């Protein structure tokens, strides 16, 4: 991933890649709406989705150390993305998605919790109703555009019918299932990088300049050794 980002940086299609910052600096706020609109027009997955830009969500000088977050550059406007290697194009689209989602409208929904009693035992379920898709519309469009993309079951909304307090419901079926808990998953290169980034987080003061093991520029090299 870092190699792809480095190549995109050398082609002037994205900013400096060796950073773990998630924020931009205040001097970038004025030009951000133009950049967001340009990036959105260059990305095929955003067709038909309205784009907004709330700069306040990503501008924070205090949370930027040496370099701001990785974002696409204005050179996308005249770039032929179809000519990029597949890996570079996919990484560039992912960087663009993260920027567009970060400044998009919030995803808003209402949640309903239902508790039912049966044979003296209580059972609870929850369901969501989306009010405004917000940034999730972009995320869903990006995922659906990927070939062989697995459905995002973790964020799949469970829709409940209209219910009222004290209502009696028929039981369609019931079953007792036995199972075993799963052991923690083995570390992968991706989860190791994340663990290095947050190592010792609980023991560090809030205003610490750096946290974790290594830096964005050295963590991948440490794992390779």
Give the residues covered by each predicted segment:
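Core catalytic DNA strand-manipulation module of type IA topoisomerases
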Residues: 1-225
């Amino acid at each position: 991933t870092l190699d792809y980002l480095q190549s995109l940086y050398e082609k002037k299609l994205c900013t400096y890649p060796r950073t773990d910052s998630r924020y931009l600096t205040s001097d970038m706020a004025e030009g951000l709406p133009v950049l967001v609109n340009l990036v959105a027009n260059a990305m095929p997955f955003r067709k038909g989705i309205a784009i907004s830009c709330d700069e306040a969500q990503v501008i924070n000088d205090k949370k930027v150390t040496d370099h701001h977050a990785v974002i696409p550059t204005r050179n996308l406007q005249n770039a032929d993305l179809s000519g990029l290697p597949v890996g570079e194009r996919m990484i560039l689209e992912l960087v663009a998605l993260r920027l567009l989602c970060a400044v998009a409208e919030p995803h808003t929904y209402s949640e309903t919790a239902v508790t039912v009693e049966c044979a003296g035992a209580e059972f609870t379920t929850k369901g969501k109703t989306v009010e405004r898709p917000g940034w999730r519309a972009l995320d869903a469009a990006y995922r659906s555009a990927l070939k062989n993309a697995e459905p995002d079951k973790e964020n799949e909304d469970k829709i409940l019918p209209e219910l009222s307090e004290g209502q009696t419901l028929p039981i369609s079926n019931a079953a007792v299932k036995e199972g075993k808990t799963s052991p923690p998953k083995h570390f992968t290169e991706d989860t190791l990088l994340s663990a290095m980034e947050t190592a010792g987080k609980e023991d560090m003061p809030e205003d610490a300049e750096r946290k974790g093991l290594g830096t964005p520029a050295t963590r991948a090299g440490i794992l390779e050794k």
